[in-house]
Amino acid sequence: MTGYALKSRAGVVPGGRCRGRAPGIVAALSLAAATPGALPQTPGSSDWGYYGGDALGQRFSSLDQINRGNVARLAPAWTYRTGELGAGFASAGKLTFEATPVLAFGRLYLETATNVVIALDPESGRERWRFDPHIDRARRYAQASARGVSVWAASEPADGVCRRRIFAGTLDARLLALDADTGRPCSDFGAGGEVDLTRGLRIRDAGAFLVTSPPAVFGKLVIVGSAIGDNRAADVERGVIRAYDAQSGAPLWAFDPLPDSASHPAAADWNLAQAQSTGAGNSWGVMSVDHEHGLVLVPTGSASPDYYGGQRLGTNRFANSLLALDARSGRLVWQQQLIHHDLWDYDLAAQPVLGDVEVEGLPVPAVIQATQTGMLYVFERSRGQPLFPVMERRVPSSHIAGEQAWPTQPFSSLPPLAPQRAVLAEDAWGLTVWDRYECRKLIAALRNEGIFTPPDTRGTLLTPGYIGGVNWGGTAFDQDHGRIIAAVNLLPMVVTLLTPAEYERQVRSADYPHSQFGRQAGTPYAMRREPLLSPWGLPCTAPPWGTLVSVDLRHNRIAWQSPLGSTEGFTPWFLPAREFGMPNMGGPIATAGGLVFVGAAMDGYLRAFDIETGAELWKHKLPAGGQATPMTYRAGATQRQYVVISAGGHGPLGTTRGDYVTAFALPPARAAR
């Protein structure tokens, strides 16, 4: 997991060249479009009952009480404080409040970074209950975040407690089942309301195998992935996807993206001995559920470690892939690998988005996957064929002994959301002549051949950097207009391979204040990584460093892009804040009111943009960093619409720490309809 922190369609032969659509696909797609299936709604028919708004992950709300015409009057309605500020927590420097609440059964449910689950009144923000699973706060965890919870209700009337349940994962790798009404553990689930997710797995470091995203729910199944601490070693924990019975907690199926035997569907593409001594390939982001086709869509990350692959040669099939699994059995239905032999930490972090995409005038059930490379891919949902051409293109080779970078990578024909070319010395930017001079020297010294340049001992410039592109914040989908909206990072990063001796020297020095280090034990090289910054700590490339981008899928074009975030709080006192566009963590949501709401940027504002033009219409300063994805719902006798965001800051990004959940609404008289 990253720490930092239709004109013409074509398919692609895995590992091969671009080709035309397979015979008969148009007829098959026409049939699929003509017979849409109705998806089950969230228990309680709530407006935002899933982390991604709905099971499809569209992050789109049909609410329009707040709209272009009145959003300027939006104001805080209530604020709740969780009390989680890191006291007594050994990993307090990593605390990141990324929670998106869900609305179900008349309550808002959310989870703090230390896995305290809380139920709130949606109108007032008053606490209804809270449950603390008491994770070991003295343990050092690889991550310290939790993005949300999932809800479930028995399909048949049942007596007693826990008919309606909240499921949540924890930093110490437990799956919790809580009574949605009281917050008490469901005694009939696992052992006293929890399942130990480490059972049956190879655990090298208990603090580095975690759950940071809400599980997927399909019928009576709860499906969970894992986050695994990056770059410790080659032989780390494996990213097994598992399903449990929502009532009893009994294990029902497991799917390991990495082959463990010759019968595994990816075995032919791996050296099995290497596969067995490799880890990760995990799904740490949010999965999506396709009830119509009975699928769970699973985005996976890199095999371990991220920046040296000499001991995991080949494409590393099923790592860095979009997997479509049969939700009932865990059987692989189809897969598309979007990064071959990852050497850049380009995990598939964004939630897959399910919806209809227009193809030759017909709506086709599709899955849209945004990536940290800044590329968007669109596949037909039931069989996984590309709906926009995907082409294998040659990319730079490795100069490192023992490394075999894959010679091609799959490029989408949709316009990229982030630049892919090399950063040139003449691109150097800075506030002073000295800044620009030092940045030119830095750029000239690095290996730098554009996207997919392999890591090197001289240092490699990554464009996009290892935070994206599009990270876990994902995308919002306005299906009626065929628009995908994403918060995008554009800041280049530097990765350097180090000998073990050089690693020990550098990690003990004070010369790398902006750097992260990883030992990558079991390989010849450790790694160091950092943003491309001048000696003053300013970016070496011109702004924007973060944007909000809208892609028009009907016309295969960028509809608009706007800088996301200002330099407020990050510039000397004598310089004015500028709307340059800043690095961001968190995602957008879209509404039928013609608005896109997004926090994410480092300056701590929640913003509203016009969904048609990208113009900023409103912003409000949050009490702490808003590195989370907002949500919206209606509640109360007047069905007042609220927009809610968690504001607690992001440890690795260094934004203001806090413990706030803030709701915004129109003044009551204006909210009435």
Regions found by a protein language model. Give the residues of each.
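Beta-propeller blade signature
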Residues: 178, 238-250, 315-329, 383, ...
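Blade/loop signatures of beta-propeller domains
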Residues: 39-79, 257-264, 432-456, 558
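N-terminal cofactor/phosphate-binding cores enriched in small/glycine residues
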Residues: 57-152, 168-187, 191, 195
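Bacterial N-terminal signal peptides
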Residues: 23-34
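A structural motif specific to WD40 beta-propellers
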Residues: 77, 126-130, 186, 252-253, ...
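Extracytoplasmic beta-rich repeat domains
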Residues: 80-100, 130-159, 191-214, 256-286, ...
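Phosphate/diphosphate-binding loops
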Residues: 351-399
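Repeat-blade elements of multi-bladed beta-propeller folds
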Residues: 48-52, 93-116, 141-174, 207-233, ...
